[in-house]
UniProtKB/Swiss-Prot annotation:
One of its GO terms (cellular component) is cytosol. Keywords: Cytoplasm, Methyltransferase, RNA-binding, rRNA processing, S-adenosyl-L-methionine, Transferase. Pfam families: RrnaAD (PF00398). This is Ribosomal RNA small subunit methyltransferase A. Belongs to the class I-like SAM-binding methyltransferase superfamily. rRNA adenine N(6)-methyltransferase family. RsmA subfamily. It catalyses: adenosine(1518)/adenosine(1519) in 16S rRNA + 4 S-adenosyl-L-methionine = N(6)-dimethyladenosine(1518)/N(6)-dimethyladenosine(1519) in 16S rRNA + 4 S-adenosyl-L-homocysteine + 4 H(+).
Amino acid sequence: MSNKVHLGHTARKRFGQNFLTDDSIISRIVGAISPDNDHVMVEIGPGLGAITEPVAMSIDKLSVVELDRDLVERLQNHPTLKDKLDIHQGDALQFDFSTLQQAGKKMKVFGNLPYNISTPLMFHLFEFAEIIETMHFMLQKEVVLRLSASPGCKAYGRLTVMAQYYCQVVPVLEVPPHSFTPAPKVDSAVVRLLPYANKPWPCKDVTVLRHLCTTAFNMRRKTLRNNLKQLISDEEFGLLNIDASLRPEQISVEQYVALANLLCDKQ
């Protein structure tokens, strides 16, 4: 049998499917997620149910979002899971997670995310941060390093700034390739994202912050002065005590928010 086949299902490359099969890793992830009935529990990409089953068995109801029709059908016919699941067949990148809201409950969102969509999916989920209590995701280790990076690190970038604007970022554990079928060609890691109830550095318009970060990091080897010359003058950098000769990865999330708020005030 091909190493791409697990439990009779062939992993689809276009969906970025790698199925978690290591029981000890699964147990640690479920422990980190801490499923309960006080939150709306939501899984993105349940796949063949490695994490789905232990989570669903410990709560009343689990909402799942799955794109692959074959996997949706398996879940709908699963002998023990079918009555526990609220199944949504569709693309998580387009899904309106606010439709899963319940009165008085925030969400706990988790998943073994397809690596080919993990970054755009993060940006999509940040839009729902106010209704989410925790997020736990299996990601490419490189993405976790980017999410948790500090200023001055090579991994620090647009994703870092936006993630840390919305959330506290906590790496949880590293997962080797042999924990999956088929084994991915990269190392993986689990990250915990805790959306802030009160953001430490509130931005007047997050759209402006996103645009600022995209522009600043577009050419990483150039200075802030060069990259942002159409937006911010040397005098304005000086007002905020930001050195315009620094590169984009050398200033903090707080400083990016200060620059964005300056731009908001100019509009």
